[in-house]
């Protein structure tokens, strides 16, 4: 089974009004993958095609049960893009770390610092990411989304190391 850590960047928090602007993915043995496109439908089609080509996979996120997966579903519905049912194909590292309890504190950056992985963001914060997309600064956008995917990957590996997976 291919394990893929991923992260979405969006223009806001509402999947009915806001859109996905970047998807970053990291897996063992593969190069990092970043999908971004001004046309959200094309981006979603590329994402689902990538997963389909992976065959047997597990999609690993951070807070994805409450955010990323919802965005993927709602935005794909909007654009009539064929999806893969992710119900039994995902792992949410935040839920796993909290043993299934939906404790709302603890950001990805905090978990990363906790396990000793400190990414380099070039000073960007999540709230500034839509500006990178708006100003077509795709290099910084790609770097940001892949750093989040890497943080998720390292957290997932630590959860396996300590026996929570």
Language-model-detected regions and their locations in the chain:
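Metal-dependent phosphoesterase core characteristic of DEDDh/y 3'-5' exonuclease domains
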Residues: 18-31, 57-165
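Conserved RNase H-like, two-metal-ion catalytic cores of nucleic-acid enzymes
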Residues: 1-53
């Amino acid at each position: 089974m291919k394990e893929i850590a991923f992260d979405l960047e969006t223009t806001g928090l509402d999947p009915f009004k806001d859109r996905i602007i970047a998807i970053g993915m990291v897996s063992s043995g593969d190069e990092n993958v970043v999908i971004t496109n001004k046309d959200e439908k094309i981006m979603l089609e590329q994402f689902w095609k990538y997963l389909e080509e992976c065959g047997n996979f597990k999609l690993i996120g951070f807070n994805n049960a409450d955010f990323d997966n919802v965005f993927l579903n709602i935005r794909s519905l909007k654009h009539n893009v064929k999806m893969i049912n992710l119900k039994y194909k995902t792992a949410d590292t935040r839920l796993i770390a909290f043993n299934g309890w939906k404790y709302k504190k603890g950001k990805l950056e905090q978990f990363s610092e906790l396990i000793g992985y400190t990414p380099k963001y070039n000073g960007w914060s999540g709230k500034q990411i839509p500006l990178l997309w708006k100003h077509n600064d795709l290099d910084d956008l790609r770097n940001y989304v892949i750093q989040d995917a890497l943080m998720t990957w390292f957290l997932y590996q630590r959860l396996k190391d300590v026996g929570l997976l």
